[in-house]
């Protein structure tokens, strides 16, 4: 089984969204796709939060470049 990545999960989530928006799925099929989509969205969100925690901004202070944590405004 292939390792789940952010990119593959996002692509699958986009496909599920298209399938749900098409209106061609049964109620049961729609619920299954919705559940799968929720799981994929949670995975993507976790990946984004992890990436955000790793982002650092390089600041020049006293002639030296220093890494500081990223803070949202």
Curated annotation (Swiss-Prot):
One GO BP annotation of this record: DNA catabolic process
Return the broad EC class: hydrolase
EC assignment: the record states: 3.1.11.6
Q: Cellular component per GO?
A: cytosol; exodeoxyribonuclease VII complex
Q: Does the keyword Ribosomal protein apply?
A: no
Q: What is its main location?
A: cytoplasm
Q: Which UniProt keywords apply?
A: Cytoplasm, Exonuclease, Hydrolase, Nuclease
- InterPro entries the record matches: Exonuc_VII_S, Exonuc_VII_ssu_sf
Catalytically driven reaction(s):
Exonucleolytic cleavage in either 5'- to 3'- or 3'- to 5'-direction to yield nucleoside 5'-phosphates
Q: Which domain of life is it from?
A: Bacteria
Gene Ontology molecular function, alphabetical: exodeoxyribonuclease VII activity
> Where found, per UniProt?
Cytoplasm
The UniProt family comment states: Belongs to the XseB family.
Subunit organization: Heterooligomer composed of large and small subunits.
Database matches in PANTHER family: EXODEOXYRIBONUCLEASE 7 SMALL SUBUNIT
Summary of the function given for this chain in its UniProt record: Bidirectionally degrades single-stranded DNA into large acid-insoluble oligonucleotides, which are then degraded further into small acid-soluble oligonucleotides.
Record's protein name: Exodeoxyribonuclease 7 small subunit
Originating species: Desulfotalea psychrophila (strain LSv54 / DSM 12343)
The gene name reads xseB
